[in-house]
Design a protein with these regions (language model features):
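ABC ATPase NBD coupling module
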Residues: 65, 79-96, 114, 122, ...
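Conserved ABC transporter NBD signature motif
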Residues: 66-78, 341-350
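Conserved ABC ATPase "signature" region
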Residues: 77-78, 130-149, 349, 400-418, ...
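Conserved ABC ATPase signature
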Residues: 153-158, 162, 423-427, 431
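A short, proline-enriched helix->beta-strand linker immediately N-terminal to the Walker B motif
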Residues: 173-177, 442-446
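A short, surface-exposed alpha-helical micro-motif characterized by mixed small hydrophobic
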Residues: 221-223, 490-492
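ABC ATPase "signature
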Residues: 236-240, 248, 505-509, 517
Length: 543
């Protein structure tokens, strides 16, 4: 191997808070060569992201500490001992990073154009028409439709997948030598995953760019990475050429990862269950206002005349690419967005109800959002976060009774009840998502809207979460609206499926029939991309 671009030697990271010391990373050593892709894989909490953040010295120092033996060399320059000025020149220029949760990484007060142009100005001095042209070029490269129209958009006006594409465009703006990608395709639908991975490979070939890929998706690792390093409990337990590690894993933990995948069949009933939620001709249109007087000149038809039926104790899967209207449909059905069309829940019309009349029903209809870090208050412990709903709905007469309910909810999603007093920033992305699910489950709802609930979870925890959701459904007759781009998880959970594109349903029906014999070309393209990701030279997806 030639001289490495990045050399990590004896990297150790410890966090010291409230008199406690937590060793997150223990004596990790890695090399990445120019143009190489190294995948760092492991379950949530294994230390993957902490390792990546250490490279650019983005940890919360001095709460985080390295040992004196730690060395991180980028082209011979020691980043651990670099000055702030040296680090500023490297960050976003020679080394760029794509973070796991785009909503917390993008500035909510700045437009798309301003945020991407900022890095061009800082590192290349580019401004004005040249910067705008480069921003548009980058947006097109990452597959954002109608790039020119997105320049003035704010992060909250974009879907989760679109926000992640903005992050990737920002990272690629200065053609870095090393791109650190922390779950870069987690929020993306399967077809865009293939295009983004193809884009990253093309950029590597053009610029000799190296890629440190942090992911829990072993399908992506197998198809993209040159080498792989497997991490658990802060230590690397196996490294090697990807094909060899997948063919003959040596460590028991590696074998455990490779055997983990969502399995099983959705809950099925001998008799057709009663309808719990139904909507007819359901619409969510967003007005387009232009001019000084902000007159409405048109509408974005995010959801356009959809019929939805959810039965008691069953799962309705809603699938489609980012921007198809999946999340908007879920928020609209919950009366969190202005909508048109009748919504009937348990025989009651919801659409005419005001805020006060809806409140008692909020306990029965809960939601788990896509981005857990945005939906969890950083100022509250996870115990307080889960307790909020109990207080609002007056469940549990005493703090002791509420604490018992909270601990049961945390245990049910695979979290140690002893972590009840810790804060969201002390958890990994996957662990935060489990907190969000516990917050919803503690109220024992009848209907749960799950918006990409497993997208931030590693494969083995995905499988555990699917088993958990299926078990809860069987025991409590829970109904789910399961919104996801991960068709493997939908297949394991959903009894019925809606396939959405551009705000309308292109195919719907029994999930087994749709997965085995998809009728619509769009559905067939989604299936092909989900179960075997390959990208043509044009960026189109094929099997």
């Amino acid at each position: 191997m030639a001289e490495p671009l990045l050399t990590i030697r004896d990297l150790s990271v410890a966090f010291e808070t409230a008199g406690q010391r937590v060793e997150a990373v223990k004596r990790v050593s890695l090399d990445i060569g120019k143009g190489e892709t190294l995948a760092l894989v492991g379950e949530s909490g294994s230390g993957k992201s902490v390792t990546a953040l250490s490279v650019l010295q983005l940890l919360p120092y001095p709460l985080a500490r390295h040992t004196p033996e730690t060395r991180i060399l980028f082209e011979g320059e020691d980043l651990v001992r670099a000055s702030p000025r040296q680090l500023q020149a490297i960050r976003g220029g020679r080394v760029a990073m794509v973070f796991q949760e785009p909503m917390t990484s993008l500035n909510p007060l700045h437009t798309v154009e301003k945020q991407i142009a900022e890095t061009l100005l800082l590192h290349k001095g580019m401004r004005g028409p040249a910067a705008r042209a480069r921003v548009i070029e980058l947006l097109r490269l990452v597959g954002l439709p109608e790039a020119e129209k997105r320049l003035d958009a704010y992060p909250h006006q974009l879907s989760g997948g679109q926000r992640q594409r903005i992050m990737i465009a920002m990272a690629l703006a200065n053609e870095p030598d090393l791109l650190i990608a922390d779950e870069p395709t987690t929020a993306l639908d399967v077809t865009i995953q293939a295009q983004i991975l193809k884009l990253l490979r093309d950029l590597q070939e053009r610029f000799g760019m190296a890629l440190l890929l942090i992911t829990h998706d072993l399908t992506i690792v197998q198809k993209v990475a040159t080498r792989v390093a497997v991490m658990t409990r802060g230590e690397i337990v196996e490294t090697g050429v990807t094909a060899e590690v997948f063919a003959q894993p040596q460590h028991p933990y590696t074998r455990h990862l490779l055997e983990s995948a969502p399995k099983g069949q959705p809950v099925r009933h001998t008799k057709t269950p009663p309808v719990l939620l139904q909507a007819k001709g359901f619409k969510v249109w967003f007005p387009i206002r232009t001019g000084v007087l902000r007159r409405t000149t048109g509408y974005v038809k995010a959801v356009d005349g959809i019929d939805v039926t959810v039965r008691e104790g069953e799962t309705l899967g809603v699938v489609g690419e980012s921007g198809s209207g999946k999340t908007t449909l879920g928020l609209g059905l919950l009366r969190l967005l202005k909508s048109e069309g009748a919504i009937v829940y348990d025989g009651k019309r919801l659409d005419p109800l005001g805020t006060g009349a809806m409140r008692p029903l909020r306990r029965e209809i809960q939601i788990v959002f896509q981005d857990p870090f945005s939906s969890l208050s950083p100022r509250l412990s996870i115990g307080q976060i889960v307790e909020e709903g109990l207080k609002v709905h007056r469940i549990g007469e005493t703090p002791k009774a509420r604490r018992a309910l909270i601990e049961d909810a945390l245990t049910s999603v695979g979290l140690d009840p002893a972590t009840i007093d810790r804060y969201p920033h002390e958890f990994s992305g996957g662990q935060r998502q489990r907190v969000a699910i516990a917050r919803a489950l503690v109220l024992k709802p009848r209907l749960l809207v799950l918006d990409e609930p497993t997208s931030a979870l590693d494969m083995s925890v995905q499988a555990q979460m699917v088993d958990l959701l299926r078990d809860l459904q069987a025991r409590h007759s829970l109904a789910y609206i399961f919104i996801s781009h991960d068709l493997r998880v939908v297949r394991a959970l959903a009894r019925e499926v809606l396939v959405m594109k551009d705000g309308v349903v292109v195919e719907s029906g029994d999930s087994a029939a749709i997965f085995e014999r998809p009728q619509h070309p769009y559905t067939r393209a989604l299936m092909a991309a989900a179960f075997e990701i390959k990208a043509e030279e044009t960026g189109a997806v094929r099997t």
